[in-house]
A protein has these predicted regions:
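Accessory C-terminal segments flanking Radical SAM cores
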Residues: 1-99, 109
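C-type cytochrome heme c attachment motif
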Residues: 83-84, 122-129
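Short functional micro-motifs and their immediate structural scaffolds
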Residues: 90, 125, 132
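Short cysteine/histidine-rich zinc-coordinating motifs and their immediately flanking basic loops
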Residues: 93-102, 132, 136-140
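Leucine-rich repeat
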Residues: 173-178, 204-209
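Single conserved hydrophobic/aromatic residue that forms the stacking wall/gate
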Residues: 232-243
Length: 243
C-alpha cells in the first residue's frame, strides 16, 4: 500500500465549522463532535479565524506530514491522519487518497475553504443541515413539533454562527499571497451565488493578474444567478472554469 498522497501539497481545506484539515477525510484534533466518522487524532486543527490559510499550509505539522509521506513508509503520523483512507483501502475500497510517484510542483493548490457562510435558498434533503441555513430553519420548525428531529439531525452540534448564516472570514490578502501556487479555487457554501463576499476574492485575483491562471469551480444549485458570474470566466486559464 502506497503511503504517498498529493492532498497535503495540493489542497487547502476548511470544513463547515471553520476548521483547517489536510483534506476532508483527515482525522484531526477537531474541536467539535460530529466531524468525519466522529474519529479524532492529536493532529492540530486550528480555526480559520485564528490562523491564516498560508500559516496553516506552511505550518511545521503540515511540513512533517509531507516529510513522512516522502519517506515512503507508514509512520504513526500517517496512520493517525490518514486512518479513514487506510481503512477504506484495507477493505478493498478505493480511498480518497491520490498516490503519485513524485510530489507535485508549480500550481498545485486547490483552495476549498468554507469562508463565506452557509446561507442557502433551498432545503435539499441530501445536504447536511450545517451546510444550509434553510435546512437549519426547517429543522427548528420540526423541533417545535417533536424535539427528536433536532437530535436526529444533530442540531445541538451546530455553532451559534451557523444558525445565522454561518461564519464569514476575510482572507483575501492571504489568498493573494498564495495565488502563484493556486491551480483551482472551489467556491462552496451554502449557495455561493447568494454570498457576494466571495467576489471580493475573485476581484482581488483579477487585480493582481492571477485569475487567468486559476480554474474556478462552484458548488451551486444554479437557481440564483443574480450576479453575472460569467464575466469572471473570461479571466480563466484556457476557459476551464466549471460553473
Amino acid at each position: 500500500m502506497s503511503v504517498f498522497c498529493t492532498y497535503p501539497w495540493k489542497q487547502l481545506f476548511s470544513d463547515s465549522y471553520g476548521v483547517y484539515m489536510p483534506c476532508c477525510m483527515a482525522t484531526v484534533d477537531h474541536p467539535h463532535d460530529g466531524c468525519w466518522h466522529g474519529a479524532k487524532s492529536d493532529f492540530p486543527a486550528p480555526k480559520v479565524n485564528e490562523v491564516s490559510p498560508s500559516e496553516f499550509f506552511y505550518s511545521d505539522y503540515m511540513k512533517q506530514l509531507r516529510s513522512d509521506m516522502r519517506g515512503g513508509k507508514t509512520t504513526p503520523l500517517i496512520n493517525k491522519v490518514c486512518a479513514n483512507c487506510i481503512n477504506e483501502e484495507k477493505q478493498g475500497r478505493r480511498g480518497l487518497r491520490n498516490p503519485q510517484q513524485n510530489e507535485p510542483l508549480g500550481r498545485v493548490i486547490e483552495v476549498k475553504l468554507r469562508l463565506f457562510g452557509n446561507a442557502c435558498n433551498l432545503s435539499c434533503y441530501m445536504c447536511r443541515i450545517k451546510d444550509s441555513s434553510s435546512r437549519i430553519k426547517q429543522t427548528e420548525k420540526l423541533m417545535e413539533i417533536d424535539p427528536e428531529f433536532g437530535e436526529m439531525l444533530e442540531y445541538d452540534k451546530l455553532l451559534d454562527e451557523m444558525k445565522h448564516g454561518g461564519m464569514n472570514y476575510n482572507v483575501t490578502e492571504d489568498i493573494k499571497k498564495l495565488a502563484p501556487r493556486i491551480q483551482k479555487i472551489y467556491i462552496i457554501g451554502g449557495e455561493p451565488f447568494i454570498m457576494p463576499r466571495h467576489y471580493e476574492v475573485l476581484n482581488a485575483l483579477i487585480e493582481i493578474d492571477q485569475a487567468k491562471n486559476i480554474i474556478l469551480k462552484y458548488h451551486t444549485n444554479l437557481t440564483k444567478l443574480e450576479w453575472d458570474c460569467l464575466l469572471y470566466t473570461s479571466d480563466a486559464a484556457d476557459d476551464k472554469q466549471c460553473v
